[in-house]
Amino acid sequence: MKIVLLYYFVNMFISGIFQIANVEVGQHFYWSILGFQIHGQVLINSWIVILIIGFLSIYTTKNLTLVPANKQIFIELVTEFITDISKTQIGEKEYSKWVPYIGTMFLFIFVSNWSGALIPWKIIELPNGELGAPTNDINTTAGLAILTSLAYFYAGLNKKGLTYFKKYVQPTPILLPINILEDFTKPLSLSFRLFGNILADELVVAVLVSLVPLIVPVPLIFLGLFTSGIQALIFATLSGSYIGEAMEGHH
């Protein structure tokens, strides 16, 4: 009996090693729109995530009452959580108008990350590549990071006008190149941190599912869900921090 079990696990392990070659990285399904090549699966994934967020938002805010029910309690907790992030990072005077932006970033990234682990994307076949979390594509994370860059530039210019650019020569003009470089490294760090963590998590789970499909991947999936939530929180927190920094002028 022991020999049979040993043979079974060895055979499963060897078969899994050969299946690892089927784990695709960087495969894309392209759409050609007005002469531009667009990642079709990213658009599909993103719209699915947006529809999920939209449905949950409508469902949980329908028929609001003074004494909240379960679904209303849930959406109030989410709103309070996002509001606290914005208030902490941006400040009590300016945070209110940035709650929608911070909330949009957090919810989109959070649902995108979780969708990669919870939605069985592989049942939907594409001519090339496969569906998955939108945030496992560098184009998505780079786009979100660029939006945050535009947001904190707008926040600084809107509050300070052209005097906003004084920060580049403070406390001394010698730091001008470093201060300019900082504005390029912020979106880079935001995009690559999110992309790297989500892609690595999905690849590790895919490889382990091929090697040991029954036991090992389950706790890793739960760990991945926790990590995905943390990454959404980090992105939203840093976005709020950069916006608050732009308005206050602190480094």
Curated annotation (Swiss-Prot):
Chief localization: plastid
GO cellular component: chloroplast thylakoid membrane; plasma membrane; proton-transporting ATP synthase complex
InterPro entries cross-referenced by the UniProt entry: ATP_syn_F0_a_bact/chloroplast, ATP_synth_F0_asu, ATP_synth_F0_asu_AS, F0_ATP_A_sf
Molecular function GO terms recorded: proton-transporting ATP synthase activity, rotational mechanism
Segments traversing the membrane: 3-23, 38-58, 99-119, 138-158, 203-223, 224-244
Keywords attached to this entry: ATP synthesis, CF(0), Chloroplast, Hydrogen ion transport, Ion transport, Membrane, Plastid, Thylakoid, Transmembrane, Transmembrane helix, Transport
Its membrane topology: Multi-pass membrane protein
Gene3D superfamilies (alphabetical): ATP synthase, F0 complex, subunit A
Highest taxon above the source species: Eukaryota
Alphabetical list of Pfam families matching this protein: ATP-synt_A
Subcellular localization(s) per the UniProt record: Plastid, Chloroplast thylakoid membrane
Subunit structure: F-type ATPases have 2 components, CF(1) - the catalytic core - and CF(0) - the membrane proton channel. CF(1) has five subunits: alpha(3), beta(3), gamma(1), delta(1), epsilon(1). CF(0) has four main subunits: a, b, b' and c.
Function: Key component of the proton channel; it plays a direct role in the translocation of protons across the membrane.
NCBIfam families xref list: ATP_synt_6_or_A (TIGR01131)
HAMAP family: ATP_synth_a_bact (MF_01393)
The protein, known as: ATP synthase subunit a, chloroplastic
Organism the protein comes from: Euglena gracilis
Organism lineage string: Eukaryota, Discoba, Euglenozoa, Euglenida, Spirocuta
